[in-house]
UniProtKB/Swiss-Prot annotation:
Subunit structure: Part of the 30S ribosomal subunit.
UniProt function note: One of the primary rRNA binding proteins, it binds specifically to the 5'-end of 16S ribosomal RNA.
Organism the protein comes from: Macrococcus caseolyticus (strain JCSC5402)
Keywords from the named record: Ribonucleoprotein, Ribosomal protein, RNA-binding, rRNA-binding
InterPro entries: NA-bd_OB-fold, Ribosomal_uS17, Ribosomal_uS17_bact/chlr, Ribosomal_uS17_CS
Family matches, as NCBIfam families: PRK05610.1, uS17_bact
A Pfam short name: Ribosomal_S17
PROSITE patterns in the record: RIBOSOMAL_S17
Name of the protein: Small ribosomal subunit protein uS17
Gene Ontology cellular component terms for the protein in this record: cytosolic small ribosomal subunit
GO molecular function terms attached to this record: rRNA binding; structural constituent of ribosome
CDD domains hit by this protein: Ribosomal_uS17
UniProt keyword annotation of Metal-binding present: no
Gene Ontology BP, a term: translation
Amino acid sequence: MSERNNRKVYTGKVVSDKMDKTITVVVETYKTHSLYGKRVKYSKKYKAHDENNTAKMGDIVKIMETRPLSATKRFRLVEVVEESVII
């Protein structure tokens, strides 16, 4: 059971919810340049499993690493942290 606690958990923004039971989440993070020490912002997209299609585009969500669910899905939706405002 201790392995479950070692799984990566990311918070990001949903940029696509067009697939069935799958969302695309962009996670922004900072990395320090090895020589100059400047913090550089970069982003990465992850596909995550959304069993009930609860997350919508623009939502802030929390995703957790899991076993491979398809060729590209290695994460699952944990919770919707903040829902997007639709105008």
